[in-house]
Design a protein with these regions (language model features):
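Extracytoplasmic c-type cytochrome modules immediately beyond a signal peptide or single-pass transmembrane anchor
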Residues: 4-64, 68-69, 77-84, 88-89
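N-terminal domain-onset segments
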Residues: 1-41, 111-202
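An exposed acidic His-Trp-rich patch
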Residues: 50-137, 141
Length: 202
């Protein structure tokens, strides 16, 4: 038997939505499998579903508010808050009892995520192009309701019910620098040519 320690350590399964950092209308379902690496850092691999033939579509790092506030301003542009994803009920932990899920999200509500998708599966059935920066929703009226309804039916969950159950979760003040798109401008990756450095190690 081959040991697969990182895979075995992925103890958390989450489902939510991501939007492309430069286009709110492009929202996709994201299935996360996460490791709690340190007290202030989670790392997740992201698939398009929780199925045997699921496509690997990206990664996300999740950090504490304290760690986020310590980041350089330029780095903060890459991060999004999780407050609305938690409070709205959009982010869910399928199969976890409500009490345990509530406790988990009470901690997650103050965290920040940096997400890149490597497969634009909303457009192509192949991982073309370069990784794209993704963001999270931050308010009512932004989410693709058809996408949420389809997700809820498939997973047997109720976003509205989860929203009601999480009404008592306190939302901390959002740290400056996150969710840059809310100010009208954002950042995104792009492919460009550059000179190749032929310097060798020796």
């Amino acid at each position: 038997m081959q040991p697969k320690y990182p895979l075995e350590a992925m103890s958390t399964y989450l489902n939510g939505l991501h939007m492309y950092a430069d286009e709110m209308g492009r929202q996709v379902e994201a299935t996360h499998f996460c490791i709690h690496l340190r007290h202030d850092l989670h790392q997740c691999v992201i698939f398009d579903s929780n199925a045997p033939d699921a496509r690997l579509i990206g990664i996300e790092y999740i950090i504490s508010e304290e760690r986020f506030r310590s980041l350089p301003d330029k780095e903060k542009q890459l991060w999004h808050s999780h407050h609305y994803e938690v409070k709205s009920g959009i982010l869910t932990a399928p199969g976890v009892p409500e009490t345990a899920e509530h406790a988990y999200f009470s901690d997650l509500v103050s965290t920040y995520g940096k997400t890149f998708h490597t497969w634009q599966y909303d457009r192509d059935d192949f991982p073309y192009g370069i990784p794209q920066l993704m963001m999270g929703l931050t308010g009512d009226g932004q989410a693709d309701e058809d996408l949420i309804r389809a997700r809820d039916r498939r997973l047997g969950v109720s976003t509205q019910r989860k929203r009601e159950n999480r009404a008592d979760i306190h939302v901390p003040k959002i740290a400056p620098g996150a969710n840059p798109w809310e100010g009208g401008q954002t950042v995104q990756t792009r492919l460009e040519k550059m000179d190749f450095n032929r310097h060798t190690v020796n």
